[in-house]
């Protein structure tokens, strides 16, 4: 199995539920076609470098996965036929050096995803209550 990274940009006009639905669709497509998702990174809504189809913003999402080369062909086909995807890219990591870089990126993304969950929650501080002023006669 080869190492891949894909990033796609979803139209900003979709509702948050529709965006999650699109993301899950592509994650399921990777799994259904024999791929193994190693990490995902939700980059959120960002400004585009230039306007694409009259959109100045887009919702970015990155998936790191391992699969056979045939999956990439199917994934690109699914990206192309969906009008809600503004842009996409699939990057293949071939050499040992590139695969080590891929492993490092996957580790960073997984650590970043775990960090907020393990952080202790601080108790909110209460402001001191000021004594009420009594009216003078």
UniProtKB/Swiss-Prot annotation:
The keyword Iron-sulfur does not apply. GO terms for biological process: translation. GO terms for cellular component: cytosolic small ribosomal subunit. Keywords: Ribonucleoprotein, Ribosomal protein, RNA-binding, rRNA-binding. CDD domains: bS6. Gene3D superfamilies: 3.30.70.60. Residues 119-137 have a biased composition (Low complexity). Residues 113-137 are annotated as: Disordered. One of its GO terms (molecular function) is small ribosomal subunit rRNA binding. Signal peptide: none annotated. Belongs to the bacterial ribosomal protein bS6 family. Binds together with bS18 to 16S ribosomal RNA. This is Small ribosomal subunit protein bS6. It comes from Wolinella succinogenes (strain ATCC 29543 / DSM 1740 / CCUG 13145 / JCM 31913 / LMG 7466 / NCTC 11488 / FDC 602W) (Vibrio succinogenes). The lineage of its organism: Bacteria, Pseudomonadati, Campylobacterota, Epsilonproteobacteria, Campylobacterales.
């Amino acid at each position: 199995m080869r190492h891949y990274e894909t990033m796609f940009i979803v139209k900003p006009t979709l509702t948050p539920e529709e965006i999650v639905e699109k993301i899950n669709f592509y994650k399921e497509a990777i799994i259904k076609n024999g791929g193994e998702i190693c990490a995902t990174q939700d980059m959120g809504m960002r400004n585009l470098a230039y306007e694409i189809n009259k959109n100045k913003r887009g919702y970015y999402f990155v998936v790191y996965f391992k699969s056979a080369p045939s999956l990439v062909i199917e994934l690109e086909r699914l990206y192309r036929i969906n009008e809600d995807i503004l842009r996409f890219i699939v990057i293949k990591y071939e050499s040992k050096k590139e695969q080590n870089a891929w492993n490092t990126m996957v580790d960073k993304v997984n650590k970043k995803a775990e960090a907020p969950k393990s952080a202790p929650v601080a108790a909110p501080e209460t402001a001191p209550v000021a004594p009420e002023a009594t009216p003078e006669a």
